[in-house]
Amino acid sequence: MSKLLLGVNVDHVASLRNVRGGKFPDPVQLAILAEIAGADSITTHLREDNRHINEKDVICIKKSIQSRLNLEISTKKEMINKAINILPYSCCLVPENRQEITTESGIDVIKNKKYLKKVICKLKSLGIKVSLFVDPIKNQILSSSEINADCIEINTGKYSEQDKKENKEEINLIKLCAKYANKLGLEVHAGHGLNYFNVRSIVNIKEIKELNIGHSIISRSLIVGMQNAVKEMKDIIYSEKIKWQ
């Protein structure tokens, strides 16, 4: 049985800290607790406006954790330079809109193919694994393969927002796209809006190798603590994976 990895996004620890402008809660400490509880990687989204995690946080997290740092960034030159300075294990390139509350859609690989190819080439030359956050659309996935991305992260936002009846169609689309990406030689990840309830159907897609989950785990941690919140998610992932073997 292949292990499904869990990346824990700690952005919203910083969001809570920034409400009062102090030092606590510290995203570095929570990243360490997530790792102790079984997180396979730590994800941070370093935004252009530093609305939650900032560059200092990311550097401290990288120095403090034993697992992998996955850095989500926009494709602006300034942000790519920050990634080069930080040198994370992996970078996930995402679209960014200053007015959005959270990432609203996947990156348009087709439209930005030439530029993205240069960015990917530069990051990979420094030993950084590169992922593209894409909507479950075959043409976007094909373009991701053509510009030598290592991975795609399928946007599960639409699936996560729908009720049970509607999301059957979306989950089938995600399955098809995951299989397609796998055939193209891309490693497949998934994330956005996943929680302790809707993650179960995603776990059953064998081509998906890693999930990135943040808000629901951080929210749960306010009730049960960070380590228990991560363990509960890992238990759900493991039990569902076993069930479908």
UniProtKB/Swiss-Prot annotation:
InterPro entries: Aldolase_TIM, PyrdxlP_synth_PdxJ, Pyridoxine-5'_phos_synth. Belongs to the PNP synthase family. 1-deoxy-D-xylulose 5-phosphate binds at D11, H12, R47, H52, T102. GO terms for biological process: pyridoxine biosynthetic process. Gene3D superfamilies: Aldolase class I. Homooctamer; tetramer of dimers. GO terms for molecular function: pyridoxine 5'-phosphate synthase activity. Catalyzes the complicated ring closure reaction between the two acyclic compounds 1-deoxy-D-xylulose-5-phosphate (DXP) and 3-amino-2-oxopropyl phosphate (1-amino-acetone-3-phosphate or AAP) to form pyridoxine 5'-phosphate (PNP) and inorganic phosphate. It catalyses: 3-amino-2-oxopropyl phosphate + 1-deoxy-D-xylulose 5-phosphate = pyridoxine 5'-phosphate + phosphate + 2 H2O + H(+). Its main location: cytoplasm. Pfam families: PdxJ. It is found in: Cytoplasm. This is Pyridoxine 5'-phosphate synthase. Keywords: Cytoplasm, Pyridoxine biosynthesis, Transferase. 3-amino-2-oxopropyl phosphate binds at N9, R20, G193, G214, H215. The record marks E153 as: Transition state stabilizer. It comes from Wigglesworthia glossinidia brevipalpis. The active site is at H45 (proton acceptor), E72 (proton acceptor), H192 (proton donor). The lineage of its organism: Bacteria, Pseudomonadati, Pseudomonadota, Gammaproteobacteria, Enterobacterales.
